[in-house]
């Protein structure tokens, strides 16, 4: 089907949706909000204690939130671990998720959700082509499917799209997607659900990417920043791992920061890093993290092994459970940065950071209607994909263009008027970097993550 036909079909679908879909969600859940550089549950500081959850990995891509029986089976294990959050990398936005999301809510568990799938994502080798209206329709439909649940903690706009110096040229498109998601949430009059990015932990541009996602006008800035970190390999320590330097370098950062993946498996995992992550050594800067990963897949990071309805606990399960049981959150507010705020945009430093100005691509023209009409029904996993389909952006966005359409609601929980302190960009030898636990469907697909 030609791109023009796809666009026309989407327009027909969108025109029939004048309001957000009705979702039977729990009303007695306290949503997570952003204050300064921290998350809060009401007036109490919220630290993410979670795992990454995508049973089946790359060999059998499935939506675990649409699998009510499997979800309830695994919630029992989540509760045993003492979790309050799970991350899911791919969901089918054509399916119903009420039963699992409500069961998670009953267990006090929140969801951090990646909006992308392997077929609907930004291609780091062709970011301009893959940032199109067909792609945006898919991820907006995913927002529609989950925004009604109060235990939807946050959305990830991408995962490790930038994984080296040359791929940093895709950063404006990652930031544009983040902007568009935030604008869609506000324009559709959903509650303020944080949107951020999950970065690769690479010395070449980790700090620059963090700075970039928190610079510019409020409508362009992210609500949080996260990165995947496998640099603490037991036996280790706060200093030996280099985590002390990362805390130093991120001190003064104006957004909530957390680990979207952690848990090096080079040696026997004891999860010694848990005691540091939830201590005052780090809580002024970090808001917890997500252990990779719940189910045993080919990369051998699993806490449990799933076979049908049976779940077998592996040694790492007990190790993590013990680490969490021994580690409580700090009392009070954890010395968070109450001011928050924007920082200056990073200067171009090719080949490590190949972004030469602050300009972002404008939202593709056919996608603008979704802000007022809604995205329509999501195509789900069966959809044809968006990598080379749809209409691309043809203009540069003006500052403020990501403000809500037909709404005066605030675009962020923090303000650039209170500028964050400057971050310290480390030398490339700051700390060892261990190869992460995830691979992509293709070496060029950034956001479409497939777990192994």
Swiss-Prot record:
A Pfam family the protein falls into: Glyco_hydro_72
Glycan attachment points: 249, 337
Polar residues composition bias: residue spans: 325-340
Compositional bias segments (type: Low complexity): 393-419
Residues annotated as catalytic: 160 (proton donor), 261 (nucleophile)
Post-translational modification: The GPI-like anchor contains a phosphoceramide lipid group. The anchor position has not been determined.
Lipid-substituted positions (GPI-like-anchor amidated alanine): 419
GO CC terms, sorted: plasma membrane; side of membrane
Keywords linked to the UniProt accession: Cell membrane, Disulfide bond, Glycoprotein, GPI-anchor, Lipoprotein, Membrane, Signal, Transferase
Disordered: region residues: 325-419
Protein name: 1,3-beta-glucanosyltransferase gel1
């Amino acid at each position: 089907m030609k791109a023009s036909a796809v666009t026309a079909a989407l327009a027909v679908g969108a025109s029939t949706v004048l309001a957000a879909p009705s979702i039977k969600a729990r009303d007695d859940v306290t949503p997570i909000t952003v204050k300064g550089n921290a998350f809060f549950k009401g007036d109490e500081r919220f630290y993410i204690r979670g795992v990454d959850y995508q049973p089946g990995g790359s060999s059998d891509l499935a939506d675990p939130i649409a699998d009510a029986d499997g979800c309830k089976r695994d919630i029992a294990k989540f509760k045993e671990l003492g979790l309050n959050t799970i991350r899911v990398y791919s969901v089918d936005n054509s399916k119903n998720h009420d039963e699992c999301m409500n069961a998670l809510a009953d267990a006090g568990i929140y969801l951090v959700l990646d909006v992308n799938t392997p077929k609907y994502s930004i291609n780091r080798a062709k970011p301009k082509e893959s940032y199109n209206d067909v792609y945006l329709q898919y991820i907006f439909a995913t927002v529609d499917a989950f925004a009604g649940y109060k235990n939807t903690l946050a959305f990830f706009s991408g995962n490790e799209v930038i994984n080296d110096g040359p791929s940093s040229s895709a950063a404006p498109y990652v930031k544009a997607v983040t902007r568009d998601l935030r604008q869609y949430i506000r324009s559709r009059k959903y509650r303020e659900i944080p949107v951020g990015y999950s970065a690769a932990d690479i010395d070449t541009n980790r700090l620059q990417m963090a700075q970039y996602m928190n610079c510019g006008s409020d409508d362009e800035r992210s609500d949080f920043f996260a990165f995947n970190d496998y640099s603490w390999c037991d036996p280790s320590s706060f200093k030996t791992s280099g985590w002390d330097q990362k805390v130093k370098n991120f001190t003064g950062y104006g957004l909530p920061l957390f680990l979207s993946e952690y848990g090096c498996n080079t040696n026997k995992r004891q999860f010694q890093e848990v005691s540091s992550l939830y201590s005052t050594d780090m809580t002024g800067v970090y808001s917890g993290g997500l252990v990779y990963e719940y189910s045993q897949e080919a990369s051998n990071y699993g806490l449990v092994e799933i076979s049908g309805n049976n779940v077998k606990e592996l040694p790492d399960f007990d190790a993590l459970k013990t680490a969490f049981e021994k580690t409580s959150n700090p009392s009070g507010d954890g010395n968070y940065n109450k001011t928050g705020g924007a920082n200056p945009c990073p200067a171009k430093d090719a080949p490590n950071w190949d972004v030469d100005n602050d300009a972002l691509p404008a939202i593709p023209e056919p996608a603008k209607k979704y802000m007022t009409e809604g995205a329509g029904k999501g195509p789900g996993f069966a959809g044809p994909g968006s990598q080379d389909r749809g209409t691309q952006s043809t203009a540069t966005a003006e500052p403020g263009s990501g403000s809500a359409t037909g709404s005066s609601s605030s675009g962020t929980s923090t303000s650039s008027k209170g500028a964050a302190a400057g971050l310290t960009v480390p030398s490339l030898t700051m700390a060892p970097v261990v190869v992460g636990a995830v691979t992509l469907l293709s070496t060029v697909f950034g956001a479409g993550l497939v777990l192994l």
